[in-house]
Each structure stands twice: as structure tokens, then as C-alpha cells.
């Protein structure tokens, strides 16, 4: 259904899930946890889709209101996913996707290992896909340039150990 309604969002979600699963496998996460990471990767932006459906019509929102709505998307995604029993673990990952390793993220200001491991993994895969994807206002970066940016974010935005795992996983992804 998502592929028909929002094909770009669906393609992004698939790429994020693929990168996140590869990273989770690189650190030998048990299969049930890899499955949770995959589910959360596929559904990580469901809150954005719900907000866009309710609030973005023919006229696009800009500025502060747009920023406020975007910041709410992880809470909305959590609310949607947490009512489905087999997606509750994914919900707890989705709500933490914009937490930062240094504690300056949102919504709870979690830092370091307080952030669920799945969220730390998906945050990197999500950032990488955003950096490498071309959109209306900019061209996507090369894989190498995007990985340089990911490395720059280690210790502030991202878990340094997961950045190292991402780099190993992305090498494998490029070869496949």
C-alpha cells in the first residue's frame, strides 16, 4: 500500500531497512532483533506520512509550523505502531530515531547507550540515504562523501561503534 501511495517514501524506507539490517548483521545481532530493526527501518517515517496526510494539502507548510510538525512525526509513528502488538518493539525504536549520541536530540534528550540500539543503527542508515538521495533542492552525495559525513557525526549524532559497523556493512552493500 505504501508503495502505491508514497513511492519515494517507500523506496527510502526499503533502502534504510536494507542498510540497517546489514549493519545489525555485521554486529551479529540475534535474528529476532534484526527483524525488529528491519520492521522499524521499513516503518520509521510512518508518522511523517500520517502528518502529511492530515496537515499538508495543496499548499505546503513552510517555516516554523512545518518544523514543529516534522518533530512530532516520531511521536505520531510511535502512537500508530504501539497499538499493534507485534510492532511495539519497532515503535520503541521509531520514537528514538532522532535522539543523538551527545544527548541533544529529541523527543526525550536520550544520550549514548540510553538510546535503543535499533534506533542508533537506523539513524545512520537513514542519514546515509538522505545524504545520497537526490531531491528537488539538491543532488545526492557520492557514497564516499556521505560516509565521510557519517564519520564526522560519530560521537555527536551517532554511536561511534555503530558508525564503524555501518562502514563495514556499507562496504558489503556496495559489493552486492
Task: Locate the predicted segments by residue.
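Histidine- and acidic-residue-rich, metal-dependent catalytic cores
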Residues: 1-176
Amino acid at each position: 500500500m505504501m508503495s502505491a501511495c508514497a513511492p519515494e517514501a517507500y523506496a527510502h524506507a526499503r533502502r534504510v531497512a536494507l542498510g540497517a539490517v546489514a549493519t545489525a548483521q555485521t554486529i551479529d545481532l540475534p535474528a529476532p532483533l534484526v527483524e525488529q530493526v528491519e520492521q522499524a527501518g521499513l516503518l520509521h517515517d510512518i508518522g511523517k506520512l500520517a502528518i502529511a496526510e492530515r496537515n499538508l494539502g495543496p499548499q505546503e507548510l513552510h517555516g516554523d509550523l512545518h518544523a514543529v510538525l516534522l518533530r512530532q512525526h516520531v511521536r505520531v509513528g510511535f502512537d500508530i505502531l504501539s497499538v499493534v502488538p507485534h510492532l511495539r518493539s519497532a515503535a520503541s525504536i521509531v520514537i528514538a530515531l532522532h535522539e543523538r549520541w551527545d544527548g541533544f536530540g529529541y523527543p526525550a534528550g536520550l544520550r549514548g547507550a540510553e538510546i535503543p540500539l535499533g534506533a542508533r543503527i537506523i539513524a545512520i542508515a537513514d542519514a546515509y540515504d538522505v545524504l545520497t538521495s537526490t531531491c528537488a533542492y539538491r543532488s545526492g552525495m557520492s557514497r564516499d562523501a556521505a560516509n565521510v559525513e557519517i564519520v564526522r557525526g560519530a560521537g555527536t549524532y551517532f554511536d561511534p561503534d555503530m558508525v564503524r559497523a555501518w562502514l563495514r556493512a556499507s562496504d558489503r552493500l556496495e559489493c552486492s
